[in-house]
């Protein structure tokens, strides 16, 4: 279909940049090496091209082999990537490569998963590599990050079943984002879990 045009204000871009750097969001800092495995034209690579220079983080661009497991593992290891963002299929390809090759990604600390629901199995497999998985909801019209789930920091507060259920949702709205649920007539619905 036709591409959609979305206008961003300087203010929304700056606020979004600061929000993505917060600990319960993408937690980007000057200590990070970030590999955004999302195209620049897709919701601004989830804001990473703005957050990295503001934080003083190094940003590694993956080139045209964004979903190729061996290439990603090589980039992560050669560049010392600490944080990366991508859709579930990217992570499935990386994990399949790691599983079949026995290769490790020692520097990778966290991945942000968005674009579609992240399977619990992906999160659990990343756990075996010591990588924190953060589920997020992004949308072009939102500058783009809307919610982030950094539940791993609270893992010790829950039993395994409750933690598994909690970590597969998309989390809470980030700073500056307001959300509501409406019916078909745009009437706001109660926050009652139904």
Language-model features: locations:
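Gly/Ser/Thr-rich phosphate-binding loop
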Residues: 54-57, 78-86, 92-165, 178, ...
């Amino acid at each position: 279909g036709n591409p959609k045009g979305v206008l961003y204000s300087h203010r929304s871009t700056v606020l979004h940049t600061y929000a993505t750097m917060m600990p319960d969001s993408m937690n980007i800092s000057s200590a990070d090496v970030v590999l955004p495995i999302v195209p620049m034209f897709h919701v601004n690579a989830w804001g990473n091209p703005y957050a990295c220079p503001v934080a003083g983080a190094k940003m590694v661009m993956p080139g045209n082999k964004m979903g190729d497991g061996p290439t990603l593992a090589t980039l992560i290891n050669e560049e010392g990537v600490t944080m990366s963002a991508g859709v579930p299929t990217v992570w499935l390809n990386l994990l399949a490569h790691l599983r079949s090759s026995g290769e490790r990604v020692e520097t990778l600390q966290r991945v942000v998963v968005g674009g579609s629901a992240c399977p619990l199995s992906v999160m659990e497999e990343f756990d075996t590599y010591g990588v924190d998985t953060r589920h997020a909801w992004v949308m072009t019209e939102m500058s783009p990050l809307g919610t982030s789930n950094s539940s791993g920091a609270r893992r010790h507060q829950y039993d395994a079943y409750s933690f598994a259920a909690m970590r597969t949702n998309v989390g809470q709205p980030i700073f500056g984002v307001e959300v509501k649920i409406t019916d078909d007539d745009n009437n706001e619905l109660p926050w009652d879990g139904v």
